[in-house]
UniProtKB/Swiss-Prot annotation:
EC number assigned by the record: 2.1.1.199
Places the protein is found: Cytoplasm
Pfam family, one: Methyltransf_5
Entry annotated with the keyword Repeat: no
Record GO biological process: rRNA base methylation
InterPro entries found in the cross-reference section: RsmH, SAM-dep_MeTrfase_MraW_recog, SAM-dependent_MTases_sf
UniProt protein name: Ribosomal RNA small subunit methyltransferase H
Keyword set, alphabetical order: Cytoplasm, Methyltransferase, rRNA processing, S-adenosyl-L-methionine, Transferase
Gene name per UniProt: rsmH
C-alpha cells in the first residue's frame, strides 16, 4: 500500500496541528512528510497551502496521489528538512505561517525489512533515510573501535558501548557484517537484557541510525532554519521521541524565549531579544488512548512556540560529537 493511500494519524498529530492553528491563506511546512499525516490534517483547513519535505524517495513517491488530490495547495519536495529555508525560497515563500516536524525514523521505514532499520526483520544493514551516503554496514565495516564506541554511547546511550564496539571489530575480522540479524546477534552476546527489558540491540541500532543519517545535526539546522522562515505570529511544533532529540528542542526554544537577565548579584547581560514565545511550559504527551492504540506514542513529546517580531538569533555551533564525514575519512 502506498503511504498516501493510508489515513495515517501521526503521533500527537491533532495536537501538533492544533498548535499551528492553520488558517485559510496560510503557508505551512511539513518538514517530515513521511506518510503524509500532518500534511493531511493541515489541508483540512480550506485554503491552506503546504510545502512538504522528505529526504526519503519512497515517501516522495508514495505522496503522489495526495499531491494530485490537493492540487496547487501541496508541493512535495525531496530534500533534507535542514534545508527548509532554501526549499521555501525556491517555492516563492520567503516566510511561512507554521512549521511542523516529527523527528526520527517513521513506522513505515521500521516496517520495511529491506531498509535495514530494525532488528525485528532480517535485511541489509542499511538504515539510510535517503539513498545517498554511507550505510550502517559501511560504518560498521570501516569505523575504528573507538569511533564505534563513541557513536553507540553518544547517539544510542548504550552504557556497554565499548563491549559492543569490541565485539563488532572482532566479528568483522572474520566476515563482513552486512545484515541486521548479524549485527543484532553480535550485540546480544555482550549486552544481556533482563526479562521485560528492551531488546539488547535497541540502543546500538538507534545510535547507528542517528549517526548514519546525521539526525541530530539535521535537527539543529532545521530549528535554525524554521526560526528564519517563520513570520511574526508563525508557529513551530516539534514532536520528538527520545531524550536526545527533546533536549535539543527544549534547549533551542528555552534559549530563544528568554527575557531579561542578570540578578541583584550580577549585572544584566545584553542578549538578543526573544525570537519565540513558548506555547506551553511543559511538553504535551500522548493520552492513554493514543498510547494503547500506538505504543510508539508513549515516548513522544510535543513542544511548540510562536515567533515574535525579533530578528532570528545567530545559528549556534554544532556540538563536537563524531561526524559521519570524519569517521568515514579516518576509517580503515
Amino acid at each position: 500500500m502506498k503511504p498516501s493511500d493510508t489515513r495515517h494519524i501521526p503521533v500527537l498529530g491533532p495536537e501538533a496541528v492544533g498548535l499551528l492553528a492553520p488558517r485559510a491563506g496560510g503557508i505551512y511546512v511539513d518538514g517530515t512528510f513521511g506518510a503524509g499525516g500532518y500534511t493531511r490534517l493541515i489541508l483540512e483547513t480550506a485554503g491552506s497551502r503546504v510545502i512538504a519535505i522528505d529526504r526519503d524517495p519512497t515517501a516522495i513517491a508514495g505522496g503522489a496521489d495526495l499531491v494530485a488530490d490537493a492540487g496547487h495547495r501541496l508541493t512535495l519536495v525531496q530534500d533534507r528538512f535542514s534545508n527548509l529555508a532554501d526549499v521555501c525560497a525556491a517555492q516563492g515563500a520567503a516566510t511561512v505561517d507554521g512549521v511542523v516536524m516529527d523527528i526520527g525514523v517513521s513506522s513505515m521505514q521500521l516496517d520495511q525489512a529491506e531498509r535495514g532499520f530494525s532488528f525485528r526483520f532480517d535485511g541489509p544493514l542499511d538504515m539510510r533515510m535517503g539513498r545517498d551516503g554511507p550505510s550502517a554496514a559501511d560504518v560498521v565495516a570501516r569505523a575504528s573501535e573507538t569511533d564505534l564506541a563513541n557513536i553507540i554511547y553518544i547517539f544510542g546511550e548504550e552504557r556497554y558501548s565499548r563491549h559492543v564496539a569490541r565485539a563488532i571489530v572482532a566479528a568483522r575480522s572474520d566476515a563482513p557484517i552486512t545484515t541486521t540479524k548479524a549485527l543484532a546477534d553480535i550485540v546480544a552476546k555482550v549486552v544481556r537484557a533482563k526479562p521485560g527489558e528492551i531488546h539488547p540491540a535497541t540502543r546500538t541500532f538507534q545510535g547507528l541510525r542517528i549517526f548514519v543519517n546525521e539526525e541530530l545535526d539535521e535537527l539543529h539546522q532545521a530549528l535554525d532554519a524554521a526560526e528564519r522562515v517563520l513570520k511574526p505570529g508563525g508557529r513551530l511544533a516539534v514532536v520528538s521521541f527520545h531524550s536526545l532529540e527533546d533536549r535539543i528542542v527544549k534547549t533551542f526554544l528555552t534559549e530563544r524565549s528568554k527575557t531579561g537577565g542578570g540578578s541583584r548579584h550580577l549585572p544584566e547581560v545584553a542578549q538578543a531579544a526573544p525570537s519565540f514565545t513558548l506555547l506551553s511550559k511543559r511538553p504535551i504527551v500522548a493520552g492513554d488512548a493514543e498510547v494503547a492504540a500506538n505504543p510508539r506514542a508513549r515516548s513522544a513529546k510535543l513542544r511548540g512556540a510562536e515567533r515574535t517580531e525579533a530578528p532570528a538569533h545567530a545559528a549556534g555551533d554544532l556540538p563536537g560529537w563524531p561526524t559521519l564525514a570524519s569517521v568515514m575519512r579516518a576509517g580503515r
